[in-house]
A protein has these predicted regions:
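Terminal amphipathic alpha-helical/low-complexity segments used for targeting or macromolecular assembly
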Residues: 1-61
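Flexible, glycine/small-residue-enriched loop-and-beta-strand segment within the central core
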Residues: 68-79, 83-120
Length: 120
């Protein structure tokens, strides 16, 4: 049986009961996003280092403008040139693959999770 972290990393859809949610991974991502969002514009090497630590796969050609927020980070994978503009939120409770040549506009939210809409 897979644990919650393995289920989240798997590309198949799942229903979460929020039991055993990897909170340490969430705290890690929040801390790294906080650090990233407080870097100076000229601290490109520091930004690169934080992204390499935060994201599951980070192409050297990935650029993300602050503010940036995500749930976990390990489920975000960039491939080739990927430009993510200001105020992006990625709710990566499942894998998110951002392909080469992707340009994401300001204020975009990519949400893998959803909430039940059927009251039953």
């Amino acid at each position: 049986m897979m644990n919650a972290l393995d289920i989240m990393k798997h590309p198949a859809a799942y229903v979460s009961g929020y039991e055993n949610t990897p909170t340490e991974e969430q705290y890690r991502a929040k801390q790294l996003c906080w650090e990233y969002n407080r870097t100076a514009p000229n601290e490109q090497e520091k930004r690169r280092s934080i992204l390499q630590t935060l994201l599951g796969t980070c192409s050297p050609m990935t650029g993300i403008e602050p503010d940036f927020h995500c749930d976990y980070g390990f489920n975000i994978h960039t491939h080739g040139l990927a430009v993510i503009n200001y105020n992006c939120v990625i709710l990566d409770t499942s894998p998110v693959n951002i392909g080469a040549g992707a340009f994401i506009a300001p204020g975009v939210c990519l949400a893998c999770s959803g909430h039940a809409i059927d009251p039953e």
